[in-house]
């Protein structure tokens, strides 16, 4: 089991509320892993998704897609970055997987530092960087990841000093491992070292 399964079946949502199969109403502070942060059934979201599904539901990224280009331009403008690269993917696991691979391509190293209790996804490398042996298959156990206690700056600095670290991956607000926050001093130490 990746997540604890709660005895509730959510069947519909509107705004910041969801309802279960017995029509009990809940204030949704979870948002499906924070994926639906705009609220459930937002009219603009429904209109845009419906319009796109009436045109084309999916196609490979091996061809040009003006929507991706427009999105990249809008994202770059909103973020204040004029010179950047964007790789559109489907999930956080894929984002983490590709970030770790890019780091390894860049520096040729393989060792990753991750935090105890962290969850980074279920793809091959992301699951290896996830601190949950129950979902880590033998093929994922490559000893490339060193798990350190979150916010243990001394242990982090000691590991970085070895000079063989490819990447550091931090879940700033741990969800699955409990609601644990990376503190400011720790994040500043990570930024300085990296």
Label each residue range with its predicted role.
Residues 180-194:
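Catalytic PLP-binding core of fold-type I/II PLP enzymes
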Residues 1-14, 74:
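Active-site-adjacent loop/helix segments that line or gate small-molecule/cofactor pockets in enzymes
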Residues 20-21:
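Short, acidic, Ser/Thr-enriched surface-loop or helix-capping motifs
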Residues 164-179:
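Short acidic, glycine-rich surface-loop motifs adjacent to enzyme active sites
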Residues 25-109:
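Glycine-rich loop-to-alpha-helix module at the N-terminal edge of alpha/beta enzyme cores
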Residues 24-25, 179:
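Residue-level signal for well-ordered, solvent-exposed loop/turn and beta-edge residues enriched
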Residues 73-167:
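PLP-dependent aspartate aminotransferase-fold enzymes
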